[in-house]
Amino acid sequence: MHYPTALLFLILVNGAQAFRICAFNAQRLTLAKVAREQVMDTLVRILARCDIMVLQEVVDSSGSAIPLLLRELNRFDASGPYSTLSSPQLGRTTYVETYVYFYRSHKTQVLSSYVYNDEDDVFAREPFVAQFSLPSDVLPSLVLVPLHTTPKAVEKELNALYDVFLEVSQHWQSKDVILLGDFNADCASLTKKRLDKLELRTEPGFHWVIADGEDTTVRASTHCAYDRIVLHGERCRSLLHTAAAFDFPTTFQLTEEEALNISDHYPVEVELKLSQAHSVQPLSLTVLLLLSLLSPQLCPAT
């Protein structure tokens, strides 16, 4: 293969990268928990798979767990720095949780964010909505709406999540939205019959990419699709590549007991294909330099 052809091939391949968005219930994440070596090591490897990750059930009162986790993540993954965006502490009682976004800041940036105004107090932990830029001509921005429902009010909260979608899509004048998180949308918390009556199931345009039969739990004794990702918007759906729960115990060769020290949930992930022309542009100066260096070999003097 000639050098120019090879370089062009590399550029095109480089421009066809997937963009992975994840959600993970980290099960009562505290400073004491992340300070444990195996927990930290596993969390960092899970986070490093994702371009954007929404951590749920962060209950650290010290305010030190996330900065420590971010520092270790950036030490582990040298491909580009991660940044974080955290919600306020959310909850009705003294028990509160925080949603935390981890994102690769050289690939995406937070354009705007807010906590949904839950005037009727439907949500135990109201969604922390964020709009992110994407390296895509087809879909230059995307709205994420994470939710961790309470098992006692799953149906009520998920029906209210449809209202959140309507408000968010009007706020940003965009139908390209991803709803994601630990919905508790299966087994004893929500039967299949009740699930199928949700407005997020009956209204057109919502694509549940984590299937009802998927297992998002670590314990061998359970098989429940608690954690979900729901896509909306034609542009968003057109870029869909894959979606699945990530079986981290098998991948990282952990026993069930070791895995449960991390969480009793699997992360859920969706990959979008962002193979757009402007993804290639940052390489252009490098390519020109390489071509100039190779030019004597390509065009020898006569």
From Swiss-Prot:
Residues that carry a glycan: N261
The top EC class, named as a word, is hydrolase
One cellular component term (GO) for this entry is:
endoplasmic reticulum
| Assigned protein family | Belongs to the DNase I family.
**GO MF annotation: an example:** DNA binding
Q: What is this protein called?
A: Deoxyribonuclease-1-like 1
Disulphide bridges in this chain? Answer: C187-C224
Q: Which gene encodes it?
A: DNASE1L1
Ordered alphabetically, the record's keywords are: Disulfide bond, Endonuclease, Endoplasmic reticulum, Glycoprotein, Hydrolase, Nuclease, Signal
Note the Pfam families from the entry.
Exo_endo_phos (PF03372)
Compartments it resides in: Endoplasmic reticulum
User: Which SUPFAM superfamilies does this entry report, sorted A to Z?
Assistant: DNase I-like
Protein's UniProt keywords contain Disulfide bond: yes
Q: Which InterPro entries match?
A: Deoxyribonuclease-1_AS, DNase_I, DNASE_I_2, Endo/exonu/phosph_ase_sf, Endo/exonuclease/phosphatase
- Gene Ontology biological-process annotations: DNA catabolic process
- Coiled-coil residues are none
Q: Which residues form the active site?
A: E97, H148
Give the superkingdom in one word: Eukaryota
Q: Does the keyword Disulfide bond apply?
A: yes
Q: What EC number(s) does this enzyme carry?
A: 3.1.21.-
